[in-house]
């Protein structure tokens, strides 16, 4: 059984027991979170597709960790001008473990 849900402007395909990195959620480690915007639920041959969401379906998860991703470097280089600008960015994320899918 797996489901596709939406969080942080992105869609994630998950099954029970899977650990997923999402955009930062303001929750403490160990907290339980429910995602109601479930777009699709598949259980063997039974497929439920929402228009736009599946009514009554939700994905339940537990917050495992909060953290920051790998550094992305941004470089602006002006040739022949002896000018260069560098910047770095690390995006915050929340790691959750899927504990249940209800349809």
From Swiss-Prot:
Similarity comment: family membership: Belongs to the bacterial ribosomal protein bL21 family.
Pfam families reported in the protein's UniProt record: Ribosomal_L21p
Q: Which GO terms describe its biological process?
A: translation
Gene expressing this chain: rplU
Keyword annotations of the record: Ribonucleoprotein, Ribosomal protein, RNA-binding, rRNA-binding
GO CC, any one term: cytoplasm
What is the name attached to this protein's record? Answer: Large ribosomal subunit protein bL21
Concerning PANTHER family, the annotation shows: 50S RIBOSOMAL PROTEIN L21, LARGE RIBOSOMAL SUBUNIT PROTEIN BL21M
What's this chain's function?
A: This protein binds to 23S rRNA in the presence of protein L20.
Q: Can you tell which superkingdom this protein's organism belongs to?
A: Bacteria
What would you give as a GO molecular function for this chain, any one? rRNA binding
The record describes its quaternary structure and partners as: Part of the 50S ribosomal subunit. Contacts protein L20.
């Amino acid at each position: 059984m797996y489901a596709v849900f939406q969080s942080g402007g992105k869609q994630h395909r998950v099954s029970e027991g899977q650990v997923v990195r999402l955009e930062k959620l303001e929750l403490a480690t160990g907290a339980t979170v429910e995602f109601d915007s479930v777009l699709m639920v598949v259980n063997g041959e039974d497929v439920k597709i929402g228009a736009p969401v599946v009514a009554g379906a939700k994905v339940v998860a537990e917050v495992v960790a909060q953290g920051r991703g790998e550094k992305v470097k941004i470089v602006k280089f002006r040739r022949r001008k002896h000018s260069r600008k560098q910047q770095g960015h690390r995006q915050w994320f929340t790691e959750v473990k899927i504990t249940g899918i209800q349809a």
